[in-house]
Amino acid sequence: RRLRFFILLFAASSLLFHPPFDFEANATDAWYNDSWEYRKKITASLDTVISSDLTDFPYLVSFTDSDLTKTTESDGTDIVFTASDGTTELAYEIERFDQSTGEVIAWVKIPTVSASDNTDIYLYYKGTATSSSSSVWDSSYKLVWHLNQTSTGTVDEFTDVSDTGNDGTGGGTGDITQDADRRPTQVEAKIGYGQSFDGPTQSGGSEGSGDFIWSQDVSNWPGNNGSTSDNDTTIEFWAK
């Protein structure tokens, strides 16, 4: 069945969790690869944020550093993240990079984020062009929208970066008449770009009159089980 999503809040990303961290340019651990000239050590101190260790957690790295203007590639594709040993590459996704300012927004899948001790990772840059890993968001994520696109009503314009492929379209499509006036608007958000949704998005069980994003392929969502009947689905956003 096609399921219509009416999203009621301004969201900077499908998941926002931005723990405090410190970083340093000089470090003494082993080097990832001689093709990379620089690295920064990022230290997460989460003892006041989480009560137990997190496993395979997509950790948000977001900061601006003029040193990153030295990247080899203007889109940041020479950036690589490693574990605390300095050599084990971690799965990561670069959501946004601005070489002119050194701004980077990335999601790094850390095997264990400690609740009682510092967790260190490294960011390497000015090296060989590579590509982000798609394995940050595994099959347990049914949808991950960063909501950083400009909505034009193009089908599947809001890309689902998980393996599930539940892309979305601003203002409707399919069995919903496309309405340019009901597309969300791209804005500068807490983390990179986000979407502003105008007005109530549901009224009396109908579509209502507000902005929304529509997604068609939800047959593999929890509770659906291939049924032809509608099923309740909860979407949760974390924001800070």
Question: Which residues are covered by each model-predicted region?
Answer:
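Sec-dependent, cleavable N-terminal signal peptides
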Residues: R1-D29
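Alpha-mannosidase-like glycoside hydrolase catalytic domains involved in N-glycan trimming
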Residues: F23-Q149, V161
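Extracellular and analogous surface-interaction loops
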Residues: T43-I50, S219, F237-K240
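Solvent-exposed strand-to-loop "edge" motifs in beta-rich extracellular domains
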Residues: T64, L147-T150, D232, W238-K240
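Short, ordered beta-strand-loop transition motifs
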Residues: E95-E103, R182-G192
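Short surface loop/edge beta-strand patches of beta-sandwich-type extracellular domains
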Residues: I110, S196-T234
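Short, tryptophan-glycine- and acidic/Ser/Thr-enriched carbohydrate-recognition patches
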Residues: L147-R182, F197, F212
